[in-house]
Protein backbone atom coordinates (compact mmCIF):
# COMPACT_ATOMS: atom_id res chain seq x y z
CA UNK A 1 0.00 0.00 0.00
CA UNK A 2 1.24 3.49 -0.85
CA UNK A 3 0.75 6.75 0.98
CA UNK A 4 -1.91 9.15 -0.28
CA UNK A 5 0.69 11.94 -0.40
CA UNK A 6 1.36 13.03 -3.97
CA UNK A 7 5.15 13.26 -4.24
CA UNK A 8 6.21 13.39 -7.92
CA UNK A 9 9.31 11.63 -9.29
CA UNK A 10 10.54 10.08 -6.03
CA UNK A 11 13.83 8.19 -5.83
CA UNK A 12 13.56 6.63 -2.37
CA UNK A 13 10.95 4.89 -0.22
CA UNK A 14 10.29 5.16 3.51
CA UNK A 15 8.46 2.01 4.57
CA UNK A 16 6.31 2.28 7.70
CA UNK A 17 5.99 -0.39 10.37
CA UNK A 18 2.58 -1.30 8.93
CA UNK A 19 4.08 -1.61 5.44
CA UNK A 20 2.80 1.61 3.87
CA UNK A 21 5.16 3.07 1.25
CA UNK A 22 6.12 6.75 1.39
CA UNK A 23 7.89 7.90 -1.79
CA UNK A 24 10.34 10.74 -1.10
CA UNK A 25 13.42 12.44 -2.55
CA UNK A 26 16.88 11.67 -1.22
CA UNK A 27 18.07 15.32 -1.30
CA UNK A 28 15.03 16.41 0.72
CA UNK A 29 15.72 13.75 3.35
CA UNK A 30 19.42 14.57 3.44
CA UNK A 31 18.80 18.31 3.89
CA UNK A 32 16.26 17.70 6.67
CA UNK A 33 18.17 15.08 8.62
CA UNK A 34 21.88 14.38 9.23
CA UNK A 35 20.77 10.86 10.17
CA UNK A 36 19.31 10.22 6.72
CA UNK A 37 22.18 12.09 5.06
CA UNK A 38 24.62 9.59 6.55
CA UNK A 39 22.33 6.66 5.77
CA UNK A 40 21.92 7.67 2.14
CA UNK A 41 25.67 8.16 1.71
CA UNK A 42 26.25 4.44 2.25
CA UNK A 43 26.84 2.41 -0.88
CA UNK A 44 23.80 0.44 -2.03
CA UNK A 45 24.62 -3.25 -2.72
CA UNK A 46 23.99 -4.26 -6.33
CA UNK A 47 21.67 -7.05 -5.22
CA UNK A 48 19.78 -4.90 -2.68
CA UNK A 49 16.05 -5.45 -2.45
CA UNK A 50 13.91 -2.72 -4.01
CA UNK A 51 10.34 -1.52 -3.46
CA UNK A 52 8.54 -0.35 -6.59
CA UNK A 53 11.95 -0.29 -8.25
CA UNK A 54 13.38 2.12 -5.66
CA UNK A 55 15.77 1.70 -2.72
CA UNK A 56 14.05 1.86 0.65
CA UNK A 57 14.50 1.84 4.40
CA UNK A 58 12.19 0.12 6.87
CA UNK A 59 11.23 2.40 9.78
CA UNK A 60 9.66 1.55 13.14
CA UNK A 61 7.09 4.37 12.92
CA UNK A 62 3.57 3.66 11.67
CA UNK A 63 1.88 5.16 8.61
CA UNK A 64 -0.12 7.74 10.56
CA UNK A 65 3.05 9.24 12.02
CA UNK A 66 5.02 9.12 8.76
CA UNK A 67 2.11 10.74 6.95
CA UNK A 68 2.53 13.80 9.17
CA UNK A 69 6.32 13.69 9.11
CA UNK A 70 6.66 13.45 5.33
CA UNK A 71 4.08 16.20 4.81
CA UNK A 72 6.31 18.50 6.88
CA UNK A 73 9.26 17.87 4.58
CA UNK A 74 7.54 19.42 1.57
CA UNK A 75 5.77 22.72 0.76
CA UNK A 76 2.34 21.13 1.00
CA UNK A 77 -0.45 21.47 3.60
CA UNK A 78 0.73 19.61 6.72
CA UNK A 79 -1.14 16.58 7.95
CA UNK A 80 -1.86 17.57 11.54
CA UNK A 81 -1.96 14.82 14.20
CA UNK A 82 -5.28 14.38 15.96
CA UNK A 83 -4.03 14.37 19.55
CA UNK A 84 -1.20 15.70 21.68
CA UNK A 85 0.00 12.11 22.18
CA UNK A 86 0.48 11.80 18.42
CA UNK A 87 2.24 15.18 18.35
CA UNK A 88 4.62 13.95 21.06
CA UNK A 89 5.32 10.80 19.02
CA UNK A 90 6.03 12.99 16.00
CA UNK A 91 8.44 15.14 18.03
CA UNK A 92 10.15 11.99 19.30
CA UNK A 93 10.60 10.75 15.72
CA UNK A 94 12.15 14.10 14.77
CA UNK A 95 14.50 13.75 17.73
CA UNK A 96 15.37 10.18 16.73
CA UNK A 97 16.16 11.12 13.13
CA UNK A 98 17.88 14.41 14.03
CA UNK A 99 15.31 16.61 12.27
CA UNK A 100 15.91 19.67 14.42
CA UNK A 101 14.32 22.22 12.09
CA UNK A 102 11.15 20.13 11.70
CA UNK A 103 10.97 19.66 15.47
CA UNK A 104 11.29 23.42 16.02
CA UNK A 105 8.57 24.05 13.43
CA UNK A 106 6.20 21.63 15.19
CA UNK A 107 6.80 23.32 18.54
CA UNK A 108 6.10 26.70 16.97
CA UNK A 109 2.83 25.35 15.57
CA UNK A 110 1.90 24.04 19.03
CA UNK A 111 2.45 27.54 20.41
CA UNK A 112 0.22 28.97 17.68
CA UNK A 113 -2.49 26.43 18.47
CA UNK A 114 -2.28 24.73 15.07
CA UNK A 115 -1.10 21.41 16.53
CA UNK A 116 -2.84 19.84 19.57
CA UNK A 117 -1.38 20.46 23.02
CA UNK A 118 -2.30 18.86 26.36
CA UNK A 119 -4.97 20.55 28.44
CA UNK A 120 -4.43 21.30 32.13
CA UNK A 121 -6.48 18.24 33.10
CA UNK A 122 -4.08 16.08 31.05
CA UNK A 123 -0.91 17.62 32.48
CA UNK A 124 0.32 14.70 34.61
CA UNK A 125 -0.20 12.15 31.83
CA UNK A 126 1.42 14.50 29.31
CA UNK A 127 4.43 14.91 31.61
CA UNK A 128 4.78 11.13 31.95
CA UNK A 129 4.53 10.59 28.18
CA UNK A 130 7.04 13.35 27.45
CA UNK A 131 9.39 11.85 30.04
CA UNK A 132 9.15 8.39 28.45
CA UNK A 133 10.06 9.94 25.08
CA UNK A 134 12.86 12.15 26.50
CA UNK A 135 11.13 15.32 25.29
CA UNK A 136 12.54 17.87 27.74
CA UNK A 137 10.67 20.89 26.33
CA UNK A 138 7.32 19.10 26.54
CA UNK A 139 8.15 17.83 30.04
CA UNK A 140 8.70 21.39 31.24
CA UNK A 141 5.53 22.68 29.59
CA UNK A 142 3.48 19.85 31.07
CA UNK A 143 5.06 20.36 34.50
CA UNK A 144 4.03 24.01 34.34
CA UNK A 145 0.44 22.92 33.70
CA UNK A 146 0.48 20.76 36.85
CA UNK A 147 1.06 23.76 39.12
CA UNK A 148 -1.95 24.42 41.32
CA UNK A 149 -3.12 20.82 41.04
CA UNK A 150 -2.72 18.40 43.96
CA UNK A 151 -0.08 15.73 43.44
CA UNK A 152 -1.51 12.97 45.60
CA UNK A 153 -2.01 9.24 45.05
CA UNK A 154 -5.75 9.78 45.05
CA UNK A 155 -5.52 12.56 42.46
CA UNK A 156 -3.02 10.87 40.14
CA UNK A 157 -4.49 7.36 40.22
CA UNK A 158 -3.50 5.32 37.17
CA UNK A 159 -1.31 8.13 35.82
CA UNK A 160 1.40 7.00 38.25
CA UNK A 161 1.89 3.87 36.15
CA UNK A 162 3.03 6.06 33.27
CA UNK A 163 5.91 7.59 35.22
CA UNK A 164 9.36 6.11 34.68
CA UNK A 165 12.71 6.45 36.42
CA UNK A 166 13.09 9.62 38.44
CA UNK A 167 10.27 11.41 36.59
CA UNK A 168 8.22 11.80 39.78
CA UNK A 169 11.18 13.22 41.70
CA UNK A 170 11.97 15.65 38.88
CA UNK A 171 8.34 16.80 38.77
CA UNK A 172 8.18 17.31 42.56
CA UNK A 173 11.42 19.33 42.42
CA UNK A 174 10.17 21.43 39.50
CA UNK A 175 6.90 22.20 41.29
CA UNK A 176 8.77 23.18 44.46
CA UNK A 177 11.10 25.55 42.57
CA UNK A 178 8.21 27.05 40.62
CA UNK A 179 6.18 27.55 43.79
CA UNK A 180 9.17 29.22 45.49
CA UNK A 181 9.73 31.53 42.51
CA UNK A 182 6.04 32.38 42.44
CA UNK A 183 6.11 33.20 46.16
CA UNK A 184 9.15 35.45 45.66
CA UNK A 185 7.43 37.28 42.82
CA UNK A 186 4.37 37.89 44.99
CA UNK A 187 6.59 39.12 47.83
CA UNK A 188 8.43 41.50 45.49
CA UNK A 189 5.13 42.82 44.15
CA UNK A 190 3.88 43.51 47.68
CA UNK A 191 7.15 45.27 48.59
CA UNK A 192 6.96 47.41 45.47
CA UNK A 193 3.35 48.30 46.26
CA UNK A 194 4.24 49.31 49.84
CA UNK A 195 7.09 51.51 48.58
CA UNK A 196 4.79 53.11 46.03
CA UNK A 197 2.17 53.90 48.70
CA UNK A 198 4.79 55.25 51.10
CA UNK A 199 6.21 57.48 48.37
CA UNK A 200 2.71 58.78 47.63
CA UNK A 201 2.09 59.67 51.29
CA UNK A 202 5.38 61.62 51.51
CA UNK A 203 4.37 63.68 48.49
Say what each PLM segment does.
Residues 1-81, 202-203:
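BTB/POZ (also called T1 in voltage-gated K+ channels) oligomerization domain detector
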Residues 25, 98, 134, 200-203:
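Residue-level detector of functionally special positions within alpha-helical transmembrane segments
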Residues 68, 72-161, 165:
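Post-BTB helical module
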Residues 164, 178-180:
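C-terminal alpha-helical interaction modules of replication/initiation AAA+ assemblies
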Residues 169-171:
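Aromatic/basic-lined ligand-recognition segments
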Residues 173-175, 186:
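C-terminal end of P-loop GTPase domains and the immediately downstream helical coupling element
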Residues 180-203:
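Terminal end segments
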Amino acid sequence: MSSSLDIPDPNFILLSSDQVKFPVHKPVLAMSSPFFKDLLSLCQPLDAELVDGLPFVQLSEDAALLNSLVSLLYPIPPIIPGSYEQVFALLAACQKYDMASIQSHIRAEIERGTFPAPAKAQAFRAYAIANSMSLSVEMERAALLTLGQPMTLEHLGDELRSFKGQAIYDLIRYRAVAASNNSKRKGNNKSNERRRLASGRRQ
